């Protein structure tokens, strides 16, 4: 009986690992190879996302400062960039709570926020994420290779739902 239960658990894990949710989470820093030295290697060879790719810090075209507050808001809450530009985001947490800036499509951010809500605040590392402690500043370098409207959000449980979302317009 115990063997059957273990087999079912193992097979369930295999199914989840191959599911669309697992693939989406892998793109947002929760999948295999997203932590430690493996993460560094994966970032260098990471596929392009619909909203661009990790930028080269030596080739920054512009720096944009984003402030995050405990009012669950970003300032500015909208930025405009040129297609092809590499942007360094200087992300400052003016509050007493931890915050983060995660760049993605609205669907990705919503899916990731739901995952974090159901699994707890699972800190992760990814090229499109800047975690920032209270009264600290973080950095994120991103190249926007496609035109469109993309987003940044704080996916710490409760923050995204409270409206901690910003818009990136790429032309």
Place the predicted regions along the sequence by residue:
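Extracellular/periplasmic metallocenter environments
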Residues: 23-47, 73, 127-171
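N-terminal edge beta-strand
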Residues: 56-86
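Asparagine-centered strand-capping/turn motif at beta-strand->loop junctions
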Residues: 91-93
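Bacterial N-terminal signal peptides
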Residues: 5-17
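Short aromatic-acidic-glycine turn motif
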Residues: 107-118
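Short beta-strand and strand-turn-strand segments in soluble, beta-rich domains
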Residues: 117-126
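Envelope-exposed proteins and targeting segments
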Residues: 60-64, 83-87, 97-99, 128, ...
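Beta-strand signatures of extracellular beta-sandwich domains
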Residues: 100-104
């Amino acid at each position: 009986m115990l063997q059957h239960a273990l087999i079912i658990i193992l097979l369930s894990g295999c199914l989840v690992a191959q599911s669309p949710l697992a693939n989406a989470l892998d793109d947002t820093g929760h999948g295999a190879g997203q932590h430690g030295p493996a993460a560094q290697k994966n970032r260098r060879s990471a596929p392009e996302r619909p909203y661009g790719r990790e930028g080269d810090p030596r080739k920054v075209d512009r720096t944009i400062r984003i402030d995050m507050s405990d009012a669950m808001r970003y300032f500015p809450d909208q930025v405009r960039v040129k297609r092809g530009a590499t942007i360094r985001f200087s992300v400052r947490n003016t509050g007493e709570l931890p915050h983060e800036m995660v760049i993605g499509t609205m669907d990705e951010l919503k899916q990731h926020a739901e995952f974090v809500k159901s699994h707890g605040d699972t800190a992760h590392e990814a090229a499109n994420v800047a975690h920032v402690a209270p009264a600290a500043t973080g950095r994120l370098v991103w190249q926007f290779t496609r035109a469109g409207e993309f987003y940044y959000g704080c996916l710490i449980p409760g923050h995204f739902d409270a409206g901690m979302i910003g818009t990136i317009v790429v032309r």
